[in-house]
Amino acid sequence: YEPFPEEVIRQMASRIADLHFAPTDVNKQALLKENIDNDKIYVVGNTVIDALFCLSEDVISQAKKFYEENNIEINDKLILITAHRRENHGERIDRIINAISYLAKKYDDHIFVIPVHPNPNVKEKFYSRLSDLKNIKLLKPLDYPYLVYLMKNAKLILTDSGGIQEEAPSFACPTLVMRYETERKEGIEVGVSKLVGADYDKIVAEAEKILTKDISQTRL
């Protein structure tokens, strides 16, 4: 199952659940295909997006101040990157890092901001391979408002995160999903997101389609 372990857990829980609260009609249709009774499914909206729009301007201003104090310039050439999925450990994370390194060197006028997951399988590789590149900013895991501020201002997002896949379309930010399977289909269906897996060539090719343009041309 991918994504792992979430999809396994969801499948197990679905077998015994009496009620199913689906964020969207797309999710409801997926449950119906799994032979869940229609009268057990309720479309209730997405609480992740609710939380996103509950952030106050004061909180967003604090996030802006955080980056200013840490000498991280947030401009229209910002790329946000997150990668931590268990299924991407090993050779996959190596290919992802190779792609990031290539892009950062070629587009050295862009800023690549990477909140690094504390898992040693991820952290050690990111710091050993990317810390010498001046336009890559490796950060500790960010508080939620600080991450939202980056999404709001990013020219491009590269991620294997489930949550960011849900949130990025709210900002119309082009997003490359570094997975081979995703349970979040909505962003892909509306054209904001694209599956690229951990494929070096696909990551580079799709990123370059965005990075060669002005942000005003890429916001969807």
Predicted feature residues:
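Nucleotide-activated sugar donor-binding and catalytic core shared by glycosyltransferases
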Residues: 1-114, 119-220
